[in-house]
Amino acid sequence: MAIVQTLPVPLEPAPEAATAPQAPVMGSVSSLISGRPCPGGPAPPRHHGPPGPTFFRQQDGLLRGGYEAQEPLCPAVPPRKAVPVTSFTYINEDFRTESPPSPSSDVEDAREQRAHNAHLRGPPPKLIPVSGKLEKNMEKILIRPTAFKPVLPKPRGAPSLPSFMGPRATGLSGSQGSLTQLFGGPASSSSSSSSSSAADKPLAFSGWASGCPSGTLSDSGRNSLSSLPTYSTGGAEPTTSSPGGHLPSHGSGRGALPGPARGVPTGPSHSDSGRSSSSKSTGSLGGRVAGGLLGSGTRASPDSSSCGERSPPPPPPPPSDEALLHCVLEGKLRDREAELQQLRDSLDENEATMCQAYEERQRHWQREREALREDCAAQAQRAQRAQQLLQLQVFQLQQEKRQLQDDFAQLLQEREQLERRCATLEREQRELGPRLEETKWEVCQKSGEISLLKQQLKESQAELVQKGSELVALRVALREARATLRVSEGRARGLQEAARARELELEACSQELQRHRQEAEQLREKAGQLDAEAAGLREPPVPPATADPFLLAESDEAKVQRAAAGVGGSLRAQVERLRVELQRERRRGEEQRDSFEGERLAWQAEKEQVIRYQKQLQHNYIQMYRRNRQLEQELQQLSLELEARELADLGLAEQAPCICLEEITATEI
């Protein structure tokens, strides 16, 4: 629900009200309804745009939610120029003097103004978001609607006020519109009955619009003006009955309406609520009407109680003060009831919007509360983690502090030990001073000896270099001898292989010779046989004759014998030839045997010579190696002696290194 705040409005016109700009006033519940243009300015076009953000005002006067100020639905009414206050008014186009104000209305106006100012000084009332239920126990503060901003009334099936009243009746306020209900009919009647009953009621507001302020109509004024009777061409006005009695009417065809009084402000009227403004204006105007009627006395006539009469009623007697006051109070009561009904209707109309806004605001507060709660929880967790981290750091720093204290104590102990040791070393240094001088003299002597030994060492190194060069030359000679030995050994192996081949050939020749001997024996035996046969056949041969037919018939034996004699001659020639070859082979074998034996003897001599040379080289190498080892041992011994002397001079002892000697034994190839 929206929080209602009212602003004070003085009854008397302020001197600066005509020049100072009017600040925008916060609208009431009914002023939130869009679509009602201001009568003071041009009617805005009807459009359904997105509603502006609603804002709420708490009792402390602070705006919550970060919403900006809402733009007013209607532009502010410019200040009206001050109208000179006159002491006369026009009622039914007749000049009337100013009627005396009603004492009861002035007292009530003053009391309501004081109550209104006291209410403005206090905190604004609280509205709960429940339909039709207002908060109780609010220190007895009445909840009243704020002044509505100038808007045009919505058409509700009845013609508007300017259609009845003409161009001069456009400035009627809510309180002046309520006079129509006061003099035209009861407020509780429906719109249909009021329109039908007021169809024949002529209205003539001649001097009314000129004396009215050019302010704005409140909600109750709009509702009152919407219930005006329609214009009728008939001359009679129906009389309506009210609970309090008859309402007077002035004239036979026109309603008498009083003019403005001296105390009415001429600027724009911003009342606290439609109810209070209409009550005050109705009371004051009622008193003035009563004064005007009593003053004139000739134009006032009561309405007829019969609604069906069309003829003008006779002029009534002048009404009394009590009747007028009773009518005024009844009009006030009807205005209050109408305003209360209007407020209830407006609250019912805006209930959904206000409840939705309140729920949205409540959800926004819940979201803010959840966000704040989460932020608080996160901050608490961060603070807890930071506290734990700080505690851990404090614990680590305490441990480091204890460790540093232990290290400091240990360093102090080490410092004391080092100080004691330094004192001991200083004492020993003072004691060893004379001995150091003696040691210096000995070192000088030893340095001279060392220089001599170094000179001897250089000489021995030169000899060693010479011996090394000789050793290198011997090694080169040894390599050459070994190469020659390898060559001679190769040659010997070749000769041995050749000798073996010759021996094999000799054996083969001997075997062949033996075979030839056996063949020769066989041939000898055959030759003996052939000799014997030849001896038997040495008879002189018969010279061949002419072909004897008897030779053709020679036997086979003769043919064999004659062939054997030819074969024996050929065999003898072959045997002789073989004998010559055998002798020649024997001579060649003997020559080869002699050459083989000579080569074997030469190879044996060369072998013995190489072996002797190799043994001599090996012996020389062994002697050189031994001499080198001996020289190395001497050099090492000298260096050890020098080092021992130096260490002895410095007062240190060192173990002598163990020297391992190798044994070299000669081997026979």
From Swiss-Prot:
Induction: By inhibition of NF-kappa-B signaling. Interacts with KATNB1. Also interacts with CTNNB1, gamma-tubulin and KIF23. InterPro entries: LZTS, LZTS2. Keywords: Cell cycle, Cell division, Coiled coil, Cytoplasm, Cytoskeleton, Microtubule, Mitosis, Phosphoprotein, Wnt signaling pathway. It comes from Homo sapiens. A motif (Nuclear export signal) lies at residues 631-640. The keyword Phosphoprotein applies. GO terms for cellular component: centrosome; cytosol; microtubule; midbody; plasma membrane; vesicle. Residues 1-332 are annotated as: Required for centrosomal localization. It is found in: Cytoplasm; Cytoplasm, Cytoskeleton, Microtubule organizing center, Centrosome. Residues 1-56, 92-131, 150-201, 215-323 are annotated as: Disordered. This is Leucine zipper putative tumor suppressor 2. Residues 172-181, 215-233, 298-308 have a biased composition (Polar residues). Residues 328-649 form a coiled coil. Residues 447-669 are annotated as: Sufficient for interaction with CTNNB1. Changing residue 640 to A: Induces nuclear accumulation. Impairs nuclear exclusion of beta-catenin. Residues 311-320 have a biased composition (Pro residues). The modification Phosphoserine is found at residues 249, 296, 570. Highly expressed in prostate and testis, and at slightly lower levels in spleen, thymus, uterus, small intestine and colon.
